[in-house]
A protein has these predicted regions:
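Conserved helicase motor "Helicase C" RecA-like lobe of SF1/SF2 P-loop NTPases
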Residues: 443-467
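Conserved helix-turn-beta segment of the N-terminal RecA-like "Helicase ATP-binding" lobe
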Residues: 186-210
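Conserved interdomain hinge at the start of the Helicase C-terminal
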Residues: 362-380, 417-441
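Charged, low-complexity
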Residues: 2-148, 202, 217-222, 227-228, ...
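SF2 helicase catalytic motif II
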Residues: 238-275
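Conserved RecA-like ASCE P-loop NTPase motor core of nucleic-acid helicases/translocases
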Residues: 177-184, 195, 355, 438-445
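Conserved SF1/SF2 helicase motif Ia
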Residues: 145-149, 153-156, 161-192, 270
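Inter-lobe coupling linker of SF2 helicases/translocases
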Residues: 224-225, 229, 235-239, 298-406, ...
Length: 470
C-alpha cells in the first residue's frame, strides 16, 4: 500500500469545528442533574432550591431533559441551521445559535453560489459566471473541511468546475494534496481528456487495466478510478491522504448498504464532493445517502432521517418539516438548472462535446477479422472495383462500431454490453432524462434506430422513433 502523502495534515472538519453543550443556569450558576430532575418532576410551578423559591415549567424542563446534554459537530450544526432540535419523544425544542455557532450558521448561509472565484492559474479555460460561483462554493466548503453536492443540470460543466477546484485548492492550501475522482467506466476517458485540455500541467493517473499503482503519487495529482476498481482497491486508496474525493454520477452511491457505497465511505479525505444531476430520483433517502457521505452526521442516522423527515414529508406532506430540511441542506447542495435566471444568460446557443468510448471485445474481434479479410480482397483488385470495396469496408466498420447486431442484422438479438457506443449513449440519455431534459438522437441507419428504441425500452426510457424506412 502507498504511504500517505508526506507532510499531509487534515484540514479542520465538521467534527472539530463545533462541540455543543447546553446548561440550565440559576443566577448564572449551572444546575446539576439532581436539581434538573427536581425541576422536571415538580408538581407545582415553584420549587425551593438553593435557599429560594424558583419558578419553573415542569413540562418545559421535562422536554429539556430529553435533549442530549452534548451534541457532536454535525448534530449541533444541524440544530443551529434549523433553529431547533428534536428530543427523544419527537418533540421540538427551539435552538438559538450564538457566538461561533451563529457566525458559522450565517457564513454557511452565504455560501449558496453568491461569490465568484477568480480563475486559478493553470486553468486553460474561461469559466462562465455561474461556474465561478460553483467553484467558489465548493472551495469554501472544502477549506472548512466540509463537503457538498453539486447538482447542476447535465451540460453545465461540472467537470471543468471540479478541475478548477483542484487548482484553487492546490494553490491556497498550506500543503497540497491529491484529488481522487471516482466515476463510471464510460466517462473515465473523458475525465482524462478534459483535464489534459483544461489543466495541461496537472499530472493525471488512471487506475485502469493492469497498471493500478499508487507509487510516487504527487501532491498535486488527480487520480481517476472507476467505481468497480475503487471497490477492489478501497484498502489501498484509504492509505492516501486525499485532499478531495469526488464521486461523479453519484447516484451510484445512493444505496448506503451496497458494496460501492461502503467502499467509498471507507476512503478518508479532507472533503468530499458528489456530482449528480438528479440528487433525488425516487425517495428522500437518496438525498440522505449523498449528504451523509459528503457531510457525515448532518442529517443524523438513516432511521432518524426516516422518522423526522422522510415520513412526515413523503407520507403526510408536512410543509414545516420540508422547510426545516431545506434549511439544513441548502448550504451543502448547489442545484442549478439551464433555465435559471443566473445561468441561462451565460449559456451559448449550443455546445459541442465529443465523448470517446472504447470498443467492446466483440467489436474489436469483428473489426480485426473483417479488416484482414477485406484487405486481402482489396489488394487483389483494382480500379472502380477496388474503390467500391474500400467504401463497403468503411460502411461495415461503421455498422460494427454502432453495434454488432446492426452489422449481423440481429434485430432481436441481445444488446447490452456488446457495444461501447450504445452503452454510452444509453447512459448519457438516461442521465439527461433523469434531469428532465429532452434528447434528440440521430443515426444514419434506420436499423440502428430500431436497436436504440429497444435498448431505451429495456431501461424504461420512453421515446418516439422518427426513423422512416428508405
Amino acid at each position: 500500500a502507498p504511504p500517505p502523502v508526506a507532510g499531509k495534515e487534515p484540514m479542520v472538519g465538521l467534527g472539530t469545528l463545533l462541540d455543543f453543550r447546553w446548561e440550565v443556569l440559576c443566577d448564572g450558576v449551572p444546575l446539576d442533574d439532581i436539581e434538573l430532575d427536581a425541576l422536571a418532576d415538580a408538581k407545582r410551578g415553584l420549587v425551593w432550591m438553593r435557599g429560594r423559591w424558583v419558578r419553573t415549567d415542569a413540562e418545559v424542563m421535562r422536554r429539556i431533559r430529553q435533549v442530549p446534554s452534548g451534541l457532536d459537530g454535525p448534530s449541533g450544526l444541524a440544530a443551529a441551521l434549523a433553529g431547533e432540535v428534536v428530543d427523544d419523544d419527537g418533540a421540538t425544542v427551539e435552538v438559538v445559535a450564538a457566538g461561533f455557532a451563529d457566525t458559522l450558521r450565517l457564513r454557511l448561509g452565504e455560501l449558496a453560489g453568491l461569490r465568484e472565484e477568480a480563475e486559478p492559474e493553470g486553468l486553460a479555460a474561461t469559466l462562465r459566471p455561474y461556474q465561478r460561483r460553483g467553484v467558489a462554493w465548493m472551495a469554501d466548503l472544502c477549506r472548512a473541511g466540509l463537503g457538498g453536492v453539486l447538482a447542476d443540470d447535465m451540460g453545465l460543466g461540472k467537470t471543468v468546475q471540479v478541475i478548477a477546484l483542484h487548482l484553487v485548492l492546490a494553490r491556497s492550501r498550506p500543503i497540497a494534496a491529491p484529488t481522487l475522482v471516482v466515476c463510471p467506466t464510460s466517462v473515465l476517458g473523458n475525465w482524462a481528456r478534459e483535464i489534459a485540455r483544461f489543466a495541461p500541467d496537472v499530472p493525471v493517473r488512471k487506475l485502469s487495466g493492469p497498471d493500478r499503482s499508487l507509487a510516487g503519487l504527487a501532491s498535486d495529482e488527480i487520480v481517476l478510478v472507476t467505481y468497480g476498481v475503487m471497490r477492489r482497491m478501497a484498502d489501498d486508496l484509504a492509505e492516501v491522504g486525499w485532499g478531495v474525493v469526488v464521486a461523479d454520477e453519484a447516484q451510484s452511491i445512493k444505496n448506503p448498504r451496497a458494496r460501492t457505497s461502503r467502499a467509498i465511505r471507507s476512503i478518508p479525505a479532507d472533503a468530499r464532493i458528489a456530482l449528480t444531476g438528479t440528487p433525488v430520483e425516487n425517495r428522500l433517502s437518496e438525498l440522505w445517502a449523498l449528504l451523509d457521505w459528503t457531510t457525515p452526521g448532518l442529517l443524523g442516522s438513516a432511521e432518524h432521517f426516516r422518522t423526522q423527515f422522510a415520513v412526515p414529508i413523503e407520507r403526510r406532506g408536512v410543509r414545516t418539516t420540508s422547510q426545516r430540511l431545506s434549511l439544513l441542506t441548502k448550504p451543502f447542495m448547489l442545484r442549478r438548472r439551464k433555465t435559471d435566471d443566473g445561468v441561462a444568460p451565460d449559456l451559448p446557443s449550443r455546445t459541442q462535446h465529443d465523448v470517446v468510448v472504447p470498443l467492446s471485445v466483440e467489436q474489436l474481434s469483428m473489426y480485426e477479422a473483417l479488416v484482414r479479410e477485406s484487405l486481402f480482397q482489396i489488394n487483389g483488385s483494382e480500379g472502380a472495383t477496388r474503390v467500391g470495396m474500400v467504401f463497403r469496408l468503411l460502411t461495415a466498420l461503421k455498422q460494427i462500431a454502432n453495434h454488432p447486431g446492426q452489422y449481423l442484422h440481429e434485430i432481436d438479438g441481445p444488446l447490452d454490453g456488446r457495444s461501447g457506443k450504445l452503452d454510452a449513449t444509453v447512459e448519457l440519455v438516461g442521465a439527461a432524462v433523469e434531469g428532465e431534459e429532452r434528447v434528440l438522437v440521430f443515426s444514419q441507419y434506420v436499423e440502428m434506430c430500431h436497436l436504440l428504441r429497444r435498448r431505451f425500452a429495456e431501461e424504461g426510457v420512453s421515446c418516439s422513433d422518427l426513423a422512416v424506412p428508405a
